[in-house]
Amino acid sequence: MTVRVGINGFGRIGRNFYRALLAQQEHGIADVQVVAINDITDNSTLAYLLKFDSILGRLPHDVSLEEEDTIVVGSEKIKALAVREGPAALPWHAFGVDVVVESTGLFTNAAKAKGHLEAGAKKVIVSAPATDPDITIVFGVNDDKYDGSQNIISNASCTTNCLAPLAKVLHDQFGIVKGLMTTVHAYTQDQNLQDGPHSDLRRARAAALNVVPTSTGAAKAIGLVMPELKGKLDGYALRVPIPTGSVTDLTADLSKCVSVNEINAVFQDAAEGRLKGILKYVDAPIVSSDIVTDPHSSIFDSGLTKVIASQAKVVSWYDNEWGYSNRLVDLVGLVGKSL
């Protein structure tokens, strides 16, 4: 059965999700069709931003507008809505939408996201950490916990999708007692281009000119997908002046002494086995631009593994836009199978 999808919010993640879907469809992977999008931006601008992208380049499909309310991509027609009144006012029922990808960043609370269900959708996937969802899913870590009964599902954050596979492999093999993480993260739209007012005073400073320390909920969110690690991890983010391509550094106290070779071996086994497609193992001296458009959630850098007795430092890269968007496509596919 083809899963019919509506996208609420056609910004960076909404457009990256659609591009990732097209990429997977070219390989015959995703049986998913986007039938409608909702965004208050005018449709000509949405079509332009889909066609041209400063990171991903030009979309290899013709993009045009038809009758001002339909975006045509190749031979696919997508109804473009501009409903401002919230999820419950959207005409999902009229378009036969099965799954909504909620990517506005505004309706991350389950009580608000529930409006999509009231509007006729069967399931809602929030493309961010959510408040009180039925379940938070990180592929490769707890996707087996989805049983079809959950209606509001969070795809967690891009950083949690990178960190969780890292923590899982380390914990399953060696036992994490406690740990601290830092994500060196590309700037995002919740920062200022130039110095200006912001609720987070560090993020008030110019994103392209500064390394900006700020908070991340990724470490604490690990407890949502790995309850055995609840309260054992914490950390923060350093936003840096690049548009995408981030890296997570996890330092953990383990339950036993280990060696660099032992750690690298278990990560290589996981990347080639149960976490294939989610976790990638690299031994080359890569930098951030090398992982842009890599669809993996977590790209383990074996050359950066460090150990002192029972304390270990492990590092994984991630394209915070493209990797995350590919997991959104995967999650839509997983949820669609339960319909």
Swiss-Prot record:
Binding sites annotated in the UniProt record for NAD(+): 12-13, 39, 84, 127, 320
Catalytic activity: D-glyceraldehyde 3-phosphate + phosphate + NAD(+) = (2R)-3-phospho-glyceroyl phosphate + NADH + H(+)
Pathway in which the depicted protein is active: Carbohydrate degradation; glycolysis; pyruvate from D-glyceraldehyde 3-phosphate: step 1/5
Activates thiol group during catalysis, annotated site positions: 185
SMART domains noted in UniProt: Gp_dh_N (SM00846)
GO biological process: glucose metabolic process; glycolytic process
Enzyme class per UniProt: oxidoreductase
PROSITE patterns: GAPDH
Coiled coil, from the record: none
Family stated for the protein in its record: Belongs to the glyceraldehyde-3-phosphate dehydrogenase family.
Known role: Catalyzes the oxidative phosphorylation of glyceraldehyde 3-phosphate (G3P) to 1,3-bisphosphoglycerate (BPG) using the cofactor NAD. The first reaction step involves the formation of a hemiacetal intermediate between G3P and a cysteine residue, and this hemiacetal intermediate is then oxidized to a thioester, with concomitant reduction of NAD to NADH. The reduced NADH is then exchanged with the second NAD, and the thioester is attacked by a nucleophilic inorganic phosphate to produce BPG.
Known partners and oligomeric status: Homotetramer.
The protein, known as: Glyceraldehyde-3-phosphate dehydrogenase
Source lineage: Bacteria, Bacillati, Actinomycetota, Actinomycetes, Mycobacteriales
Name of the gene encoding the protein in the UniProt record: gapA
